[in-house]
């Protein structure tokens, strides 16, 4: 998996951070893993990825080489996204870290992709459980980010996608209910969003009127 995040962001430090700051941050991150119910294996892999990033960023030669690679990439692809190539065994942990680094939308999209054939995990596996949980959490956060930008219909569509995924997986009824409640609470804002659009956007207006009728 090509994870759309660099070592600095994964660890949660500034690109100018000194080694002492990086090591303190590593300790803090390892001591406070997410407590939403991920498997022990996923959290161990998360800690391992954090340590690897810290090792690279505290080694002067490795860090200099990495920073030079980042600079070359920014010069050749100004709008490109830096990525980390992760083995399959670390994918779930990488997505958890991406979600923690405020990459909720990307984490949701990649988790949903990971639950689709042909890469879907074995039924009942820890990987399936972790990806299903992450998809719910990341979907919720991504929808909140859209709400903060007043993109209410976009937030609703994210929640609908998340609910449909949870319905298909059938593993986390409580998380599904939270997404459904969030979608319901969005209804008045969706109506205003859809009805305030340009008059030429008839589809949006009709959708807004339909939601209004359903209130």
Model-derived features: positions:
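Alpha-helical junction/boundary sensor with strong preference for TPR arrays
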Residues: 33, 73, 118-122, 159, ...
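N-terminal J-domain/J-like co-chaperone modules of DnaJ/Hsp40 proteins
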Residues: 1-38, 49, 53, 64-68, ...
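Flexible helix-coil transition and linker loops at the boundaries of alpha-helical arrays
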Residues: 39, 117-130, 167-178
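TPR-repeat structural position
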Residues: 104, 152, 159, 201-205
């Amino acid at each position: 998996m090509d994870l759309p995040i660099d070592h600095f962001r994964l660890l949660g430090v500034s690109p100018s951070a000194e080694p002492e700051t990086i090591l303190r941050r590593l300790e803090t991150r390892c001591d406070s893993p997410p407590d939403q119910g991920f498997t022990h294996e996923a959290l161990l892999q998360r800690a391992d990825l954090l340590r690897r990033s810290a090792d690279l960023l505290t080694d002067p030669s490795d860090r200099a080489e990495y920073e030079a690679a980042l600079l070359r990439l920014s010069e050749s692809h100004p709008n490109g996204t830096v990525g980390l190539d992760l083995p399959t065994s670390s994918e779930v942990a990488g997505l958890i870290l991406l979600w923690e680094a405020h990459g909720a939308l990307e984490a949701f999209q990649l988790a949903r992709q990971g639950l689709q054939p042909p890469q879907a995990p074995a039924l009942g596996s820890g990987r399936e459980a972790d990806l299903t949980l992450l998809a719910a959490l990341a979907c919720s956060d991504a929808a909140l980010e859209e709400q903060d930008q007043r993109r209410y219909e976009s937030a609703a569509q994210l929640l609908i996608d998340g609910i449909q995924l949870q319905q298909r997986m059938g593993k986390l009824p409580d998380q599904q209910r939270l997404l459904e409640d969030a979608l319901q609470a969005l209804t008045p804002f969706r109506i205003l969003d859809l009805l305030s659009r340009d008059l030429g956007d008839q589809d949006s207006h009709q959708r807004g009127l339909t939601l209004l009728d359903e209130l």
